[in-house]
Design a protein with these regions (language model features):
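Alpha-helix C-capping/helix-to-loop hinge sites
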Residues: 3-6, 22-25, 68, 124
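Conserved GNAT-fold acetyl-CoA-binding loop/helix
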Residues: 1-21
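A short helix-loop-beta-strand connector motif used in the catalytic cores of GNAT acetyltransferases and
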Residues: 20-36
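Acyl-donor (CoA/ACP) binding surface of acyl/acetyltransferases
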Residues: 34-147
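Short, conserved alpha-helical segments within structured domains
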Residues: 7-11, 33, 102
Length: 147
């Protein structure tokens, strides 16, 4: 699986370009499904299924939130709901997530949303400054979901 490298300084112009150029093509080509998150009537971030493999029933989930929304449980709730949608409406069997090991809030999101940690991909992420970090692999399996 891959993960979305959204820079910390992500600006509205970046988001607008992404929505105009990449997101519609991914949906049309059946390679990704992008959703905007709204909280209290304001844009709060994005959630997606990417690296879709509809034939084998797999996808990777990703999310990011605006800074003012973090820590309110929005990502956990949205991740749980999109996962349920993936299992019940799309028919996925397995949904994966990769998180940089130092991203403790994101690790908590996945654990609280019901994902199981499956392993560590050592030195799998290269930061902008050239340092390498481990990635943590999580997954949700349809037959285990909701237990």
């Amino acid at each position: 699986p891959q993960f979305t490298r959204i820079p910390a300084n992500y600006q509205m112009a970046n988001a607008e370009h992404y929505v105009r150029e990449r997101s519609p093509n991914g949906f049309t080509m059946r390679t990704e499904l992008q959703l905007a998150l709204e909280y209290d009537g304001k844009f709060a971030g994005a959630l997606s299924f990417h690296t879709l493999d509809l034939d084998s029933g797999k996808a990777e989930i990703g999310y990011w939130l605006t800074a003012d929304i973090r820590g309110k449980g929005v990502a956990t709730t949205a991740t749980r709901l999109l996962t349920e949608y993936g299992f019940e409406s799309i028919g996925f069997h397995r949904i994966e997530a990769l998180v940089v090991a130092s991203n403790v809030p994101s690790l908590k999101v996945l654990k609280n949303a019901g994902y199981m940690q499956e392993g560590i991909k050592r030195d799998a992420c290269c930061q902008d400054d050239g340092t390498r970090e481990d990635m943590v692999l999580f997954a949700a399996i349809r037959t285990d979901w909701g237990r």
